[in-house]
Amino acid sequence: MLKFRRKEEKAALSVQTRPEESFRLAGGAPSGPGERRLYRALRESVPIIDAAIGKLRRLLGEFTVSCPQAQAQRELEEFLQSVPVNAMEHGVQAFLGVYFEQLLTYGNAVGEMVLGGGQVAALYNASLDGIELEPKGPLEAAVSVWEGDRKRPCPYPELLLLSALAPEAGSIRGTSLLRGLPFVSEILLKIYKTLGVNWDRLGNVRFAVTCKPDPSGLYAGDRARQMAEEWRRAMHSREVSDFVAVGDVSIKAIGADNQILDSEVPVRQMLEQIVAKLGVPPFLLGLSWSSTERMSSQQADMLTSELDAYRGLLTPVIQKICRTWLALAGYDPQCRVEWEQITMQDEVDHANARYLNARARQLELKEEET
């Protein structure tokens, strides 16, 4: 008889930066949760902010890692493409995408290399709402996990990945890319809300019905009630209905004499402030401003320098992941991260060159036909 061996279940991976749900209380929150909620609300309420961060994530590009040993490089490339990330994704690019968005939105990002079987078995993006960053001397930072109303230091800090965006001198807290935008965004949302209210009123017109009674004033109340009932019947009727009244009656649309304020100028002023802070060219966000076409190449160059700076923040994170995996696999931990070239300026030039070539070809065909 054939004997079937029971398949061994994989051991659960322990993530040290994730607090136990049973011990997690609402009161145990790290410093700055209100600020993080504000930045999340900004991304949810102002689509252009969320779109800009998504554009930066996609424009960041991909990278390759080179190692001295060919076998080590092949295995490392396979690991980077297939490593489990959080609960639903695979590949180091997925981990870096969440890590980068967290860094831009909150100013800090925390990740973890999860060990299993003596190897880096998974990568995990830690939520900043469940941890607290504390300085550990002038050159180090410590991470603690909130469990209820107490903090538990992470026992293996060498497996953690930490980054800060433009921290102030002597501080481990980074600066969010959205810092300074709440005030501007509040004004923009007020304008949009007012526009919605005004258009709702224009689409659902309210009327003022005025009836001047006889000088004697006899039966004025009865006539007013009867007129109100007839007007209500005429307005609520599903079919075309007439309103018949006797006497001096005037009907006016409420607000017909008012003029809706022009919102184009203030909305553009607020959007200019937001775009300037985010560093993304307006034409990438669907804003067709007159200066965009003339300055697209210069703006592409500026975005390239921004992306290079962001890559500089992520390169040490990638190197730490790769070196840890190589060391645990028994290989030389030396490796080098090489990003693909950001040539947005060249892409613009190439697009113009293709257009000119197509135009020249079209003219040549016309000359041949004649």
Task: Indicate where each model-derived feature is located.
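Structured, contiguous alpha/beta core segments that scaffold functional sites
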Residues: 1-247, 254, 273, 357, ...
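Long amphipathic alpha-helical segments
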Residues: 135-163, 222-304, 308, 312-341, ...
